[in-house]
Amino acid sequence: MQMHQHNDQPETESMIEKAHLKKRYILASDFDQTLSFNDSGYVLADLLGISEAEFERKATGMAKLNLVQQGGELAYLLLHDPEFHSKVRPEHLREAGKRVRLKPNIDALYRFLSEEVEDYHFDFYVISAGPVEVIRSALEGIIPADHIYGTEFEYNSRGEIERILQVTAGYGKVAVVDQLLEKLKIGPDRIVYVGDGSSDIHVMLHINRRDGFTIAVSENKYLAPIAKRSVISDSALAILIPILEEVVGWEPRLIRELFESKGLLIQQWDKVQTDMLTIVPVSTPVEERSVVAVEE
């Protein structure tokens, strides 16, 4: 699994050349609570001096009105809510990105998928409904900026948000996935998508229908039944497990050996199947019926 390249060839060119010789896949991942521990909307609200409770009230209210696609609530608030719109500037979005708490080993995940899996190459992209400035700032030096898709704004001369150019929420994620497939000339069965919440439902259904592979990193009651695999971990590298098992076809022993060769130990690996049940009393109790014996 060791990489070899000529000294006179730039690393990026070597990676591209090798990618053409391997089975090429796209790994597309959500950002908030998929590659991070917290929601960037809360981080931005705190930076702007807006309380967590107030932000939650506004975002929840937007979601209930169904005016925007799920996941697009923050973009709508930044443009239309007076409190957000009057305060936020591009520099605030970039600073919020620096304050987002990332899951560990994202850089190792990117490197593994690009270089370490023999006969396979995964192009790693991030597709999020969050502002693209936040995500690119958070992942600076880890994932190339042109591999990150998020909600884009147009600003006026004062740095105020004037309009939304693109919202990558709901069906917006579907559009980005299809653009990537067309751009990279990859079949729809060679895409892996990773997400955590309701805003990922449309894109997961779209990918499943076309024989792609989907992974949930939460126990969201709407998403978990849709995803082909679920994995819960504090490490971004956990995403590798279902990919290596289901896509590459490795056995657990080989996966453990790969991790150990990189100085990592899979300390706990519990395979569970979760049944989600709600059990309540029946609305109308069944009346007991007496049995009468009739003698002739």
Residue ranges, per PLM feature:
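C-terminal cap/substrate-recognition subdomain and adjoining C-terminal extension
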Residues: 97-296
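Alpha-helical substrate-recognition element adjacent to the catalytic core
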Residues: 2-152, 157, 230, 234
